[in-house]
């Protein structure tokens, strides 16, 4: 899916995102993550093979939500994305340092020197909804 500009702006504005994956028993597992874009894929980085990554390796279905500021018809704006994720090895320090420029401050770094290469989650967007300028 080609992401609308309004969604791209929300995803790159430094709002914390809630990443929902599915545990083996079908229950939700929720993590707060920093997000960015790689083309039309949403990306987030992780130093270790956390439960959320193991969940994605078993079941690629994910949901991502974030509050985006502003109001529409008196309601707080929020963005919800449903999609499928895949995990790649390596690149976590570079992506986290890039995202630190948005989430912490210009010139900031996050990954310690010599950090393990970790993993990147790539989310292909299948459905966009919520309250805001992206509402279908």
Predicted stretch roles:
Residues 1-2, 73-136:
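Charged, gly/pro-rich active-site loop segments
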Residues 1-16:
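Extreme N-terminal tail/first-helix region
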Residues 3-6, 29-31, 49-51, 108-109:
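A generic local structural motif
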Residues 7, 49-52, 92-95, 99:
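Amphipathic alpha-helical interface surfaces
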Residues 14-48, 64-67, 78:
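Short beta-strand segments
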Residues 40-41, 53, 72-75:
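A solvent-exposed, acidic/Ser-Thr-rich amphipathic alpha-helical stretch
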Residues 59-61:
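Short coil-to-beta transition motif at edge beta-strands of beta-rich domains
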């Amino acid at each position: 899916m080609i992401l609308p500009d309004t969604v791209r702006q929300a995803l790159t504005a430094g709002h914390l995102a809630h990443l929902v994956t599915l545990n083996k028993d079908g229950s939700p597992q929720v993590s707060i993550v920093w997000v960015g874009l790689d083309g039309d894929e949403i990306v987030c980085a992780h130093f270790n093979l956390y439960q959320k990554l193991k969940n994605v390796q078993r079941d690629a279905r994910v949901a991502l939500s974030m509050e985006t500021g502003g109001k529409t018809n008196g309601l707080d704006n929020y963005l919800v994305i449903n999609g499928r994720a895949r995990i790649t090895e390596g690149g976590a320090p570079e992506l986290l340092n890039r995202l630190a420029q948005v989430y912490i401050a210009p010139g900031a770094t996050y990954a310690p020197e010599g950090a393990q290469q970790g993993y990147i989650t790539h989310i292909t967007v299948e459905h966009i909804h919520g309250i805001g300028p992206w509402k279908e």
